[in-house]
Design a protein with these regions (language model features):
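Conserved acidic residues
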Residues: 102, 131, 208
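Conserved P-loop
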Residues: 42-121
């Protein structure tokens, strides 16, 4: 499979069922978020989830993975950070881990070159029976490459943009949603500081939905902000609680 060596690819499903064309939404499992997206992530969309460490961005992506697999559709999960946890997947699967795992295909690139190879062939990998693609995180290996390659940030940024274009095209052609997660960096203004996704302009340009996962004073409660995009005219704020079983809606009232 391109330049990805076999030891970096863990395939736990070889079920070719062409059902993806009938799938329109992949729910997150969080009612507030799903209602704000009319049921979940739409087929044909590229979606960005970003936030600091421990804000549930990977958990949200894995919940979508579980919900897709339980519909009998395969998920391509590209684990760029090497943090995919079968134990965490089991916790989110509500006693149906074997059923879920059967439909999860895991690819684990070890550097930005291998991530590029995955992006180049992503349409081939998802040709039949897939309902979702997750890339977690799309900026980890990019950030590492920028740090080690002096003076080549522009070229790497352009390559990341090309990867996002490939993923967006795959999503539209295959009519399935794609989710990318991103690390963040600090943005310091005159009155307050905030965070933004790494390679902000590239990621936000391609994203149909953008969800910012923000910590609160209660470390178990996360503020999920669905940001304005060309396809979303109003910002929506939801609160979710991080539990062992996943992210759940919570009320602050």
């Amino acid at each position: 499979m391109s330049r990805i060596s076999a030891k970096h690819i863990i395939s736990v499903a070889f079920i070719f069922v062409d059902m993806a064309a009938n799938l329109t939404k992949i729910p997150t499992g969080c009612r507030c978020i799903d209602e704000s997206m009319a049921g979940g992530f739409s087929g044909g969309s590229l979606n960005l989830i970003y936030g600091e460490a421990e804000t549930g961005k990977s958990t949200l992506a894995m919940q979508c993975t579980v919900n897709c697999a339980l519909q009998g559709l395969k998920v391509l999960f590209v684990d760029c950070d090497g943090t995919f946890s079968p134990k965490r997947l089991e916790q989110l699967s509500s006693g149906r881990f074997d059923e879920v795992a059967e439909f999860v295909i895991l690819i684990r690139p070890v550097d930005f070159r291998e991530q590029t190879a995955v992006a180049d062939r992503i349409s081939e990998y998802t040709a039949k029976g897939f309902g979702l693609v997750v890339i977690d995180t799309i900026t980890g290996l990019y950030r590492a490459k920028v740090a080690e390659t002096s003076g080549k940030a522009f070229g790497l940024n352009r390559e990341l943009n090309r990867q996002m274009a490939n993923i967006a095209q795959m999503a539209k052609v295959q009519k399935i949603p794609a989710i990318v997660t991103s690390q963040v960096y600090g943005v310091f203004g005159e009155t307050e500081s905030s965070v933004a996704p790494v390679a902000t302009r590239v990621l936000k340009f391609w994203a149909d939905e953008i969800i910012a996962m923000k910590p609160t004073e209660d470390f178990q409660i996360i503020k999920a902000v669905l940001e304005e995009t060309p396809k979303r005219t109003n910002e929506v704020t939801c609160y979710v609680r991080i539990r062992e079983s996943g992210l759940q809606d919570c009320s602050l009232q």
